[in-house]
Curated annotation (Swiss-Prot):
Protein family per UniProt: Belongs to the conopeptide I2-like superfamily.
Protein location: Secreted
Function: Acts as a neurotoxin by inhibiting voltage-gated potassium channels (Kv).
Primary location: secreted
Record protein name field: Turripeptide Lol11.2
Tree of life domain: Eukaryota
Signal peptide start-end: 1-27
Annotated source species: Iotyrris olangoensis (Sea snail)
Domain comment, as recorded: The cysteine framework is XI (C-C-CC-CC-C-C).
Length: 83
């Protein structure tokens, strides 16, 4: 039981870390102006920014993050169905 709890804890920790990581190798060459004037959705609009939802945002802000509560509930359901 303790081993299972440790494994689940490590998995949650890894998922949270992956969600919080910002890609540093994804840099954009040059500046393209405002979103909507030139770049399309997902294209560069600055040195480290991308067009997302009509605004110039960092890639980490643009990506959907997992809800930690939803993740915990799904893990609890998995635990209930495996016993």
């Amino acid at each position: 039981m303790a081993r299972l709890m440790m494994t689940v804890g490590c998995l949650i920790f890894i998922v949270v870390l992956l969600d919080m990581m910002v890609p540093v190798s994804n840099t954009c060459p040059g500046y393209f102006g405002e979103c909507g004037d030139g770049p399309e959705e997902g294209e560069c609009c600055g040195m480290y920014n991308y067009c997302c939802k009509g605004r110039c945002l960092m890639l980490a802000s643009c990506q959907k993050r997992r809800d930690a509560g939803r993740l915990l509930r799904s893990l609890k359901k998995l635990k209930l169905t495996t016993h």
